[in-house]
Amino acid sequence: MRAGSRISDLKYKLMTIELLNLAKNYYTYRELAQIIGLPETVLSRYVKGHVLPTIDRAQNINRTLQKIMRLEGEIQQRIRFDDAGYFDNTHLISDTLLLERAVQHAVNAFAGMRITKVLAAATDGIPLAALLAHRLGVGLVIAKKNREVGVREFIEEIYIPSKTAIMISLFVPRDALRKGDCVLIVDDVIDSGETQIALTRIVQKAKAEVTGMYALVGMGSDWKSKIEAVTHCPVEIVLQIGKKPLAEVG
């Protein structure tokens, strides 16, 4: 077996054990034993790190847990809109256990793809992006709306959000992205797609490549064609929902 294959198998086994640990927050060992079809003692040894499953068993465990721990259902339960029709993401970005599951989902979705940086716009996408960058073992880059004192050079992208007359700038330190970087753009929600397009242009200005985009929620579908116009990277959305009409301000 090649070293690369052994490392890949080891990462998959560890990822499966992490998913099993997450499942322990929802199910008892007895329940998991019945669901997975393995003795409680075996599952306990996996969770405690005493032993790792074989790759075949890890794949079976992973597939089974993915079926019962449907991430989109958990996200759907946390969807909130205020009286004016604005999306409230508080229950998404503050739930670290949910974000850990989303990280697991993202790792599976982009398995085998080269990723050297994770890029997010401040601020709501940062919790998910930070956890995902840590799991992937790559650098985290944050695009901010203000220039930071102490940073000499920036890559700047200006965009105008739809239905507004406001110009928004995003700044990334020029040395944060390098030529040849493979960048995963991460956010909690994709709504109009304009933030993701601005981030894509920042990556392009750095002569790097957008490997993909990942978000917990996709609002409507208008953003899809907009993003496709600037990049043909894969876009992974956990839950797609329709937009709620905004209340008119009298």
Q: Residue spans of the language-model regions?
A:
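Short glycine-rich phosphate-binding loop at a beta-alpha junction
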Residues: I115-A122
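Short, glycine/charge-rich flexible loops or terminal/linker lids adjacent to PRPP-binding catalytic cores
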Residues: V138-V183
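Active-site/ligand-binding-proximal alpha/beta "capping" segment
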Residues: I185-K205, E209-T211
